[in-house]
Design a protein with these regions (language model features):
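Ferredoxin-like alpha/beta domains used as RNA- or RNAP-binding modules
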Residues: 1-35, 59-83
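Short, structured beta-strand/loop micro-motifs enriched in basic residues and often containing a Trp
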Residues: 50-58
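Short beta-strand/loop turn elements enriched in aromatics
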Residues: 34-47
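Short, well-ordered loop/turn sites that connect or cap secondary structure elements
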Residues: 47-48, 67
Length: 83
């Protein structure tokens, strides 16, 4: 016998936070600190190595990844976009 229960899912929209940089690029770990997404460089290193960060939709484990205008980093249901 099939179970006919209905399940409701509530999908939380991700908050988009825009950050302006004045240089050609910024390293991923420094960008996370600039956005206050992490508390320290050590914390940034851990979350990046653990695969918790997506850059432009792809998991990124490169702490020194260079981000430029238009790039997006995603962490804990927030999207940080470089403008």
């Amino acid at each position: 016998m099939l179970n006919n229960r209905k399940i409701k899912l509530k999908i939380k929209e991700k908050e988009v936070i825009e950050k302006h940089i004045t240089t050609e690029f910024i390293r991923l770990d420094a960008f996370l600190k600039l956005c206050d997404a992490v508390q320290s460089g050590g914390h940034a290193k851990i979350v990046i190595q653990d695969g918790e960060i997506k850059v432009n939709g792809e998991i990124c484990e490169q702490r020194g990844k260079k981000l430029r205008v238009g790039d997006k980093a995603e962490f804990e249901h927030k999207i940080y976009e470089i403008i």
